[in-house]
Amino acid sequence: MFHSLLVKNFILIDELEIEFNKGLCVITGETGAGKSILLDAILFCLGYKTSNNIIKRGKDYAVVNIIFSLNEEIKNFLIQNFIEPEELLLVKCLQKAEGRKNFFINNQVVNKAIMQQLATYLFELHGQNNNISLLEANTQRDILDSYGNLLDFRAELSKCYQTWQNTRKEIAEITLKQNSIDQEIDYLSFATEELTKLNIQIGEEEKLANIRKDLQNKDKDLQLIKDVLEQINNPEINTSINRAEKLLARQGDNERFEAIATSLEEAYNNLEEARQGLSNLLDSFNYEEYNLEETEERLFLIKAISRKYNVPADELGIFLDKSLEQLGILKNKIANSNELKAQEMLLQKKYYELASDLSVKRLIAAKHLEESLHQELKQLKMAKAIFEIEIIAGKEPTASGNDDIVFKASTNPGMATEAINKIASGGELSRFMLALKTSLFDKMVKPSIIFDEIDVGIGGEVADKVGERLKKLSSVTQVIVITHQPQVAGKADLHIKIEKTQLEKETKVTVKALNLAERQEELARMISGKTITEASLKAAKELLHL
């Protein structure tokens, strides 16, 4: 509910502050006193379109602050929009002379859209030019469902609808991606089969690289041994040594050649020893466990697979596990596709059964609401008005059912009913809304409801009936009424008077909460005009039950 309203430099207002109470609050004042300025200030603060020239002449800014109480719905909205809830809700709009508007919620800057969304949780406004909520199709549907106690049933239908739509979406995604899913399954099937068969182990690449290096070194040594053996196994070497020894032997015991003969003999023996050593070394090479060609083939294969899947060799095992998991998911999607289609058909059937039941319930509720509203309209001097609720099948199923709901009315005898916004004046729309609110009473209650001149064109007993209904409504929500009718004002819990004062160089608007004596005087003025009489004072006293 509204706690307070602070307005500065707004149109004709220098500065004013109003503190509101629970129950019924009436705002009165002479015609042209500026009562509509308060509504403009509220709409301005909450992001709705108002007059372009709202900054008071001679000032460089205008500002409006409103403080509201909180409920859980408002708190949830604030949290969803990353605004910290406090004990009370402070909303503010500041406009500077250059034209820029700044909106604040709890001193946090927000955009206009957020402010307008918040406003829908705070209050309803009904008046000469503001009955938007009644005219919206969603509001009309909510009014009917609330009246018929159908909101829980509608919630069940909505849940079924969401499940149905989610299933349809999942099927559509599978169908749309069928080709890519098939391709991915083929790819993953091949990859997992290939990697499973290769069974590449962690550290295997490094191990094979080291073995390859060792084998390459051994090959070099082997080739060297073979090359040396090839040279020293040359028969000509042995033949040459033997010939040299024989030539020296012919010299007999010639000491001069004895040392040379000994050297030749040692050379022969050393050569034989070298041959034997190289042969033994050759026999010592072991190729049973690893083969360079096979080692290189495996190593190069691992490197190729690593490049192919763009995965480090040591992570190929992890890649295989993830691929197997993804392959299972995709195969399950395909397997579940037919199951989803069957489920979608069942959900569709259930939805239309629930929607059909809801339509029947709405038709029954509509008849009762039409009758209730007709009785209320009689009391509000609209006995000849016809109100009916048209329910027709919608073009598309929705979370709220398969019905298009239109509130229709005729305010003049002989005229066909049309959509309510096309045939009713602002005052009539307000009384339609009051009749609806009275019929609903404790259902669909916003924290505050504002009625702007709901009593235009009525008086006497009808005005008293309007006041009674406003008073009744104020027992479940805060009701703020701008009125010209003393019968309505007399039932107020809080009476605020707006006055316009013409000074020498400017016009000022002031606001005052009236005490009991001041209320009597104001009601007397409303009854008899500027000249207050004893009779009007007496009538005012009776209205106040003094």
From Swiss-Prot:
CDD domains: ABC_RecN
Binding positions for ATP per the UniProt entry: G29, E30, T31, G32, A33, G34, K35, S36
Keyword Cell division annotated: no
A single Gene Ontology CC term: bacterial nucleoid
Keyword vocabulary terms for this entry: ATP-binding, DNA damage, DNA repair, Nucleotide-binding
Single GO BP term: SOS response
InterPro entries per the UniProt record, alphabetical: DNA_recomb/repair_RecN, P-loop_NTPase, RecF/RecN/SMC_N
Molecular function in Gene Ontology: ATP binding
Family stated for the protein in its record: Belongs to the RecN family.
Job description of the protein: May be involved in recombinational repair of damaged DNA.
Protein name: DNA repair protein RecN
Organism: Rickettsia felis (strain ATCC VR-1525 / URRWXCal2)
